[in-house]
Amino acid sequence: MSDIEQRVKQAVAEQLGLKAEEIKNEASFMDDLGADSLDLVELVMSFENDFDITIPDEDSNEITTVQSAIDYVTKKLG
């Protein structure tokens, strides 16, 4: 598991009250992990702070699964 993957899963776990080791990469934040729209906004802010990146609103709409968050952060960190 990459450092980015671990950090994304940890942020998701903290935000949604889950255990990081139980979070699967293919899990949908809303459908599988029970997140609501406010949780998603807070997750995006958490990713921005944790990785020191900026995620525009139009991009945040594409971050719907754990894997899409990992892929997005990886791309932004280049």
From Swiss-Prot:
Name the PANTHER family for this protein: ACYL CARRIER PROTEIN, CARRIER DOMAIN-CONTAINING PROTEIN
Q: Which residues carry this modification: O-(pantetheine 4'-phosphoryl)serine?
A: 37
Q: What does this protein do?
A: Carrier of the growing fatty acid chain in fatty acid biosynthesis.
Q: What is its main location?
A: cytoplasm
PROSITE patterns from the UniProt entry? CARRIER (PS50075), PHOSPHOPANTETHEINE (PS00012)
The protein's annotated pathway:
Lipid metabolism; fatty acid biosynthesis
Name of the protein: Acyl carrier protein
- Keyword Cytoplasm attached: yes
| Molecular function via GO | acyl binding; acyl carrier activity
Task: Report the superkingdom from the record.
Answer: Bacteria
What keyword terms does UniProt attach to this protein?
A: Cytoplasm, Fatty acid biosynthesis, Fatty acid metabolism, Lipid biosynthesis, Lipid metabolism, Phosphopantetheine, Phosphoprotein
Task: Tell me the protein family, please.
Answer: Belongs to the acyl carrier protein (ACP) family.
Name its cellular compartments: Cytoplasm
| Residues of the Carrier domain | 2-77
HAMAP family cross-referenced by the UniProt entry: Acyl_carrier (MF_01217)
GO CC list? cytosol; membrane
Q: Which GO terms describe its biological process?
A: lipid A biosynthetic process
Q: How is it modified after translation?
A: 4'-phosphopantetheine is transferred from CoA to a specific serine of apo-ACP by AcpS. This modification is essential for activity because fatty acids are bound in thioester linkage to the sulfhydryl of the prosthetic group.
Please name every pair of cysteines joined by a disulfide bond in this record: none
